[in-house]
A protein has these predicted regions:
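Transmembrane alpha-helices of multi-pass inner-membrane enzymes
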Residues: 71-73, 250, 390-444
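Hydrophobic alpha-helical membrane-interfacial segments at the cytosolic entry of transmembrane helices
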Residues: 150-161, 261-284, 448
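TM-adjacent membrane-interface loops and short helices in multi-pass inner/ER membrane proteins
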Residues: 194, 309-350, 357, 364-368
């Protein structure tokens, strides 16, 4: 009789197994048990909640998901470091991650990054990725397959629950509103806040289902049923990225069919693909029949690149203007503002380019981006060349799913995607310990973990204060007479949001200094709202810099909505009647 996934995790002795990432040798048993089964199950359950949290609020909409994922990684990292062999292997991927983690600080010192908080946030994510690579490597080396079992169980739980939330949202039910965010407006997204993010996660759920079936934790019938259920959710997301991924899955099922124990697997994958297409086609008809919202996935307007072509063209030009050093981590908005007037208005701010490689070029310059591309491409080439089992195929697909998405959007900008990818990449590298560039004692990893934990706790502490101030701001904007302006939060790391709140409360005066102008300019390059642009343009008008004031008004209309631009124009007109300096700056044509 087939044992269940939960039964496996609660067994007292792990099943003998070879290392899933080891393609040169087979182990008859694990060298040690890193995490005991009860705690492994507990970890999986807690990890599954990362992707189910409904808290998505400005100014950092994914903060709670990312922070919870990072806290769980820190806790598990300590256990793995202390309970696994003492030597830590450093390879090209971990050295690249370490180098990247240091870059934001270097860019802040050199002036490329304008606020220390931007450097702190980006370094913390990169440090988390570095830690995940090491932990995945050590965990897989010590207890093969245990990491993948725990991770895929967590993903399986969360993906099944997420499709349930999608159905809840699509049918417009009520009763669990505090556990569900929004209705999805025709594209239910569970608690991810964005349909394409959910689609990538459901693709992970399909990989997890295949893993459970391959490891005989569930039977073939159960696996097919779960896959069909997840594909229904994937169809409801109406994600075009998912179509690319499923097409790739289908092709690869034939390319790697020799690694499948069931010879009918490619045909089964094709059948499930046809089922997905049918679900996609029927959902629109069903929604119209029962008066439920639905997005037509075959709408020609959704089958084109939309604004992406213009975004990529504009930001590629921006990257070529600073080819060697870039704009600094997290500074894509600056690139958009400085180059956007050469292109038609996008009426939106883009903090990312929607292409990982272009982001890397904008952040670090083209040479660094090319270096990262070469290292990652070489890593992928080695993993593809070394495939010799269904398990290694599934782990590679796990990494390729978000990489595919990252060419069109930004899944790897979130810790709840980046950290699991790092864990699996590290696990896949565990077979190459003997090919590492150098080895060091685990004290270095403990130091990295301590630094990451201190940064994480400080960021959580800072953001809790920022969140309170932002809530005050929202109340004040709704009813200024009843609610006071927001307090300026006392923070240690997240200085950019402290300055954001300061500028909210700041009003330019005729005697404004050059330092104050530069401070407003730096903040507006990060947060180019209509209000901040108006304040900066007013300050420039006080200094007689009429042309620059007009440029900033143009930039504001280029990246804000048409209604916001109209409101800014009306506000500037009213201000001109009351202020002689502003009156000398006509609204730009």
């Amino acid at each position: 009789m087939r044992s269940s996934f939960l039964a496996f995790l609660l067994r007292k002795k792990p099943a003998p197994a070879g290392n899933v990432a080891d393609n040169t040798r087979v182990r008859t048993k694990p060298t040690s048990v890193v995490i005991r089964q009860f705690w492994l199950l507990t970890f999986s359950i807690f990890l599954s909640t990362v992707w189910l949290l409904p808290n998505h609020y400005l100014p950092w909409s994914t903060f709670h998901m990312d922070a919870w994922a990072a806290l769980l990684l820190c806790g598990m990292s300590l256990a793995v470091i202390l309970r696994s062999p003492s030597v830590a292997s450093w390879n090209s991927m971990t050295l690249m991650a370490l180098t990247l983690a240091c870059l934001p600080a270097t860019q802040f010192v050199s002036g490329s990054i304008t606020f220390a908080g931007i450097a702190w946030i980006n370094s913390s994510y990169l440090l988390g990725f570095l830690l995940a690579l090491h932990i995945g490597n050590r965990w897989e080396s010590a207890t093969p397959r245990q990491l993948a079992d725990a991770l895929f169980l967590a993903i399986g739980i969360a993906s099944i629950a997420s499709v349930g939330l999608q159905l809840y949202q699509w049918f417009r039910l009520d009763g669990i509103d505090i556990w569900s965010m929004g209705q999805g407006q025709g594209r239910p997204y569970a608690n991810f806040g964005q349909p394409n993010q959910l689609a990538t996660f459901l693709l992970w759920g399909l990989v997890a289902t295949c893993w459970a079936a391959k490891r005989a934790y569930i039977g073939p019938g159960t696996a097919i049923f779960v896959a069909a259920y997840l594909l229904l959710g994937l169809a409801m997301s109406a994600s075009r990225t998912a179509w690319l991924a499923l097409g790739f899955f289908t092709v690869m099922s034939w390319v790697w069919r020799r690694h499948c124990s069931a010879k009918y697997m490619p045909w089964l994958v094709m059948g499930l693909g046809i089922y997905f297409v049918a679900c996609t086609a029927l959902l629109g008809e069903l929604g119209e029949l029962v008066k439920l919202p639905a997005v037509d996935p075959f709408d020609p307007s959704r089958m084109v690149a939309g604004a992406r072509a213009q975004i990529w063209s504009m930001l590629l030009e921006a990257a070529l203007e600073r080819p060697f050093w870039g704009y600094g981590w997290g500074q894509v908005v600056e690139a958009q503002l400085l180059n956007g007037l050469n292109y038609p208005s996008l009426y939106s701010v883009y903090a990312q380019s929607h292409n990982l490689f272009l982001d890397l070029a904008l952040w670090n310059g083209i040479p660094v981006a090319l270096g990262i591309f070469i290292i990652v491409a070489h890593w992928l080439y080695k993993k593809v060349s070394a495939i010799n089992s269904a398990e290694s195929v599934l782990l590679l697909l796990f990494v390729l799913v978000p990489l595919n998405h990252a060419m069109l959007e930004l899944p790897l900008h979130h810790a709840y995607v980046l950290l699991p990818v790092g864990l699996v990449m590290g696990a896949m590298d565990s077979a190459e310990n003997n090919q590492s560039i150098f080895k060091a004692r685990r004290g270095i990893l403990l130091a990295i973990l301590l630094l990451a934990f201190v940064m994480l706790v400080t960021i959580i502490r800072d953001y809790s204060r920022i969140e309170r101030s932002y809530l005050q701001l929202r109340f004040n904007q709704v009813n200024p007479a009843a609610f006071a302006p927001p307090d300026v939060p006392d923070v240690v790391m997240l200085s950019q949001w402290r300055e954001f709140m300061r500028l909210i409360n700041f009003e330019p005066q005729p005697n404004i200094s050059d330092q104050q102008i530069e401070w407003m300019r730096r903040l507006t390059l990060l947060y180019p709202s209509a209000g901040f642009s108006q304040k900066l343009a007013t300050g420039l008008a006080f200094q007689g810099k009429k042309s620059e004031a007009q440029v900033w008004l143009k930039r504001a209309c280029n990246v804000n909505t048409a209604s916001q631009c109209e409101a800014l124009q009306n506000a500037w007109s009213r201000q001109s009647k009351q202020n002689q300096w502003v009156a000398q700056v006509p609204w730009p044509e």
